Amino acid sequence: MDPFDAGAGSILRQPKAVWATAGASVVAFMGIGLVDPILPSIAKGLDASAGQVSLLFTSYFLITALAMLVTGFVSSRIGGRKTLLLGLAFVVVFAGLAGTSDTVGQLVGYRAGWGLGNALFVSTALAVIVGAAAGGSAAAILLYESALGLGMACGPLLGALLGDASWRYPFFGTAFLMAIGFLCITVFLKEQPKPARKTSLLDPIRALGHGGLASAAVSAFFYNYTFFTVLAFTPFVLNMTPYKSGAVFFAWGVLLAVFSVLVAPRMQRRFGSLKVLGGSLVLLAADVLVLGYGNHTAAIVCTILSGAFIGVNNTVYTELALGVSDAPRPVASAGYNFVRWFAAAAAPYFAPKIEEWTDVHIPFVVAAVTALLGAVVVLVRRRALTADAEELEPKHASEDSVTVFAN
């Protein structure tokens, strides 16, 4: 059964607690791409290099990677509601402080604290929505994925609209919206039951002992380097006004959401997960090569088009991570995300460095190579990945309490 069909009738008839959590989730996902359109403005305003400003992504995702070992540990002990509120409080404080920064070092540090808050919130939000939603898990998952897609698409747009006046305003805007989310969840959401078993800090690491899960994580590590070269380095290459850059990444986010939620599951049913993933990685490699060597118009088109391939890849990778081993889904996903988010931290740092050492084209060559390396891992390790992957009935990528960053 298509989860969209199952959930369509009941998705809008939800308790206030669900809408409060879903609304805060939109803002949380907006925080990932919020800085894209204003990266050049931040560099100019703080007299910083592209490499220094790109550390906004590096600090954010480095903390996110490490937090994957902590979120399950925390939520299984203090409960979902308190974990959400703790995460929101971190975001409100550190996003607000980011807007007051006078140096790029301060901004990078505050962005790291923001990343911890976002990890705590987003890794818990789906489980809370499923627990509180009316109409079953299908309706809850559809609502959550809609919030995810809306946030990923609107983050760059909000960054552009507020950032056109000052690069500081998007940070203040995020803090304000998350403060509203904090109040809504405080008022409307009751405490959720705690898990029967508490998660240890080492459970995600132990889960990586499974060959299939480790293979999925390594392949996703290479792919994420490509993904975040596009997300963090391309704004400097395009060198557009915040409005124009925001429009480009809004279109990118729309394609990402549509292909992740609507297109990828249908392609999987027709061709199989591994074939879809391998083909999409090769196409992404070709896309970033053209992005790096084409003219300005080609770079814009390829940036937007990459959202389609990224959306497909995110969905398939997450389902592999959830289904290839016998570890509990939150534990398997935490281990998988722990590995792959290190690439999301590395790409924004190394892409500008590679440009300094060579020229503006080579970072995209490296990104194309890493996408192909991801495809090679899928090919070489297909037996370990096929054990369950090809028999999996495609399900929504976010059907898990820790996988949300996958999209």
Sequence positions of predicted segments:
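Juxtamembrane intracellular "pre-TM" segments in multi-pass secondary transporters
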Residues: 2-12, 190-216
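Helix-breaking motifs and short loop linkers at transmembrane-helix boundaries and internal kinks
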Residues: 47, 79, 100-106, 134, ...
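Conserved MFS/SLC helix-loop-helix module at the cytosolic interface between two early adjacent transmembrane helices
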Residues: 65-102
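Helix-to-loop junctions at the C-terminal end of transmembrane segments
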Residues: 68-79, 259-272, 355
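C-terminal transmembrane helical hairpin of 12-TM major facilitator-type secondary transporters
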Residues: 274-317
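A late C-terminal transmembrane helix in Major Facilitator Superfamily
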Residues: 324-360
